[in-house]
């Protein structure tokens, strides 16, 4: 999901943006835990 899609989506469909952002954050945390 590119950041541009988030800006394209309006208040009606903001959920997909949050889902993509949360997914990236979870992936980063998962990698950090794997390293440690």
UniProtKB/Swiss-Prot annotation:
Required for correct root growth and vascular development, probably by modulating both cell division rate in meristems and cell elongation in roots. Negative regulator of the ethylene signaling pathway that modulates microtubule cytoskeleton dynamics and auxin transport and homeostasis, and possibly cytokinin signaling, thus influencing root growth and lateral root development. The keyword Secreted does not apply. Coiled coil: none annotated. Transmembrane segments: none annotated. Keywords: Auxin signaling pathway, Cytokinin signaling pathway, Developmental protein, Ethylene signaling pathway. Mostly expressed in the embryonic root from the heart stage and in the seedling primary and lateral root tips, especially in the columella initials and lateral root cap. Also detectable in aerial parts of the seedling, sepals and leaves, principally in vascular tissues of the lamina and petiole. The lineage of its organism: Eukaryota, Viridiplantae, Streptophyta, Embryophyta, Tracheophyta. The gene is PLS. Induction: Repressed by ethylene (ACC) and cytokinin, but induced by auxin (1-NAA and 2,4-D). GO terms for biological process: adaxial/abaxial pattern specification; auxin polar transport; auxin-activated signaling pathway; cellular response to auxin stimulus; cellular response to cytokinin stimulus; cellular response to ethylene stimulus; cytokinin-activated signaling pathway; ethylene-activated signaling pathway. This is Peptide POLARIS. Belongs to the POLARIS peptide family. Disruption phenotype: Defective in root growth and leaf vascularization, characterized by more anchor roots at the root-hypocotyl junction. Cells of the root meristem and the cortex of the primary root are short and more radially expanded. Reduced meristem cell divisions in meristems and reduced axial cell elongation in roots. Enhanced ethylene-response, hyperresponsiveness to cytokinin, defective auxin transport and homeostasis, and altered microtubule sensitivity to inhibitors.
